[in-house]
Regions:
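Glycine-rich adenosine-cofactor-binding loop
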Residues: 1-15, 26
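Adenosine-phosphate binding glycine-rich loop
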Residues: 100, 104-160
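Conserved S-adenosyl-L-methionine
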Residues: 15-21, 119-124
Length: 160
């Protein structure tokens, strides 16, 4: 879910890692055209991948496609402080035990989406702290030319 920078990176990486189908859901806003462009680019550059774009407002289609999927990623601001009680998934019955749910949101550490995925028994439900940490590592390397002490940074700032 989403079509901004983080979402686009996740969608492209999913295609490069072997995803056969990618469903992009985004609000009919200024980023919707980005989603359509991303879909075309992925299909043109990565053989064997089908990318479909739908309006996030179509919850029936969203739930239908979630049921066909193995992974759900939220790369929108939904659930981010100060709206931590928000989730784009209203019907949590779509979460199954073998399902993977990830959220790019890192504040709060555990979004409503992740809490509900865990409560539903999803195999993996993880928040955005890892993404934040590794983006920081990449930026550190770009600006300093050195590797960031990632484990130390994680222990000091993100553990617990």
């Amino acid at each position: 879910m989403g079509a901004g920078g983080a979402a686009t990176a996740i969608q492209v990486q999913a295609a490069l890692e072997g995803a056969k189908k990618i469903y992009i859901f985004n609000c009919k806003d200024k980023f919707y055209a980005n989603a359509e462009n991303t879909a075309r680019k992925i299909e043109n550059k990565v053989p064997g991948v089908t990318v479909e774009v739908y309006p996030l407002e179509d919850s029936q289609k969203l739930y239908e496609k979630i049921k066909e999927s193995d992974i759900l990623v939220n790369a929108t601001k939904s659930g981010m402080k100060p709206a931590e009680d928000e989730s784009l998934i209203k019907d949590v019955s779509v979460f199954q035990p073998d399902f993977v749910v990830a959220d790019a949101v890192y504040n709060p550490r555990e979004t409503k989406l992740i809490r509900e995925a865990k409560a539903a028994g999803c195999k993996i439900a993880l928040g955005g702290i890892g993404m934040l940490l590794w983006q920081g590592e990449a930026a550190f390397r770009i600006f300093t030319g050195e590797s960031m002490p990632t484990e130390e940074v994680y222990e000091r700032f993100f553990r617990g």
